[in-house]
């Protein structure tokens, strides 16, 4: 359950919060790197040890075609390193290949974390993804869980920081590794036996929903027609809560804390630490979903943790099978593939400061306690604290006409583009947002 307060927005070009890091050197030249782009002799095929590694290697092109298009942004020395690692892979020299991968990943990581994320050349993201692919293969030494878990983390890092290569092979590799890890464990998600009681307590003690005055309540409609929604809400830019439009989604019956852990518990995700992203102590950390649930939901760490504005459904397609694209998105100008689907998963008490989004937004509550968190950090975020406004510093805020609502399970809130809104989580929540044009 969540409380949402909003008001019409102003003109501007909102941007998402971005990663920033230290300065870095420039790049020179470009090439196509890989064992197939030179005359050096390489071992045909690949020398694999074990069925898991063979299954992963089978997802990649043949050795002669295993090459990466780098472009002019990437240093020639990096292209040579890519080629070297590829040749070591082809020869089955796993330890040496792993060493080359680590050097390659360190170099690419520095470039990925230099300056704003939007300015990072996609070629460097491909290099990073390539390094993660080879690293995952190198790590699959034994049949146990530990090696596969480490390899799975490498795949997730490539999915989080890299770009799609070889037909988005990292998603397929991660699926195989995840299935292997789960088959070895042969038990529910980590900590579920001890954490279930705590999780149930967290769900059974929600904060009472605040009463919303009728004159400021967001209107509610049950399954309006496309034409009615377009004429009365989309075109005028009016918020509305749509009821009954997602009741058929599998997640409405299947999803629970335990289910999320079972399907995604061993996957590495970015977690925001801090109650709101405008706080000075706010930060981001990488951890598995199981660790996130244990630390921030079950045991309720002092620092609030939030899996916010993350494209989890691209990373874990198994979860995407449990949701759908709202029919009303067909009224937009873009294609379905251009819709950005974000997951928002966290405990009671997280706050999304007053902000606006760059596109139309549908926000869906997925289970008995779900909520969103819109994490933009720059000029699309207001300086005003909605709950404790400084009216001496911002006197005109007292004149703002606002709407409010409390989202219940299965509700879908339409938030028009650039419409200012503020969100507070009233309970443990998992929500899905759809940004569309």
Residue ranges and their predicted role:
Residues 2-412, 420-437:
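N-terminal accessory scaffold of Fe(II)-dependent oxygenases
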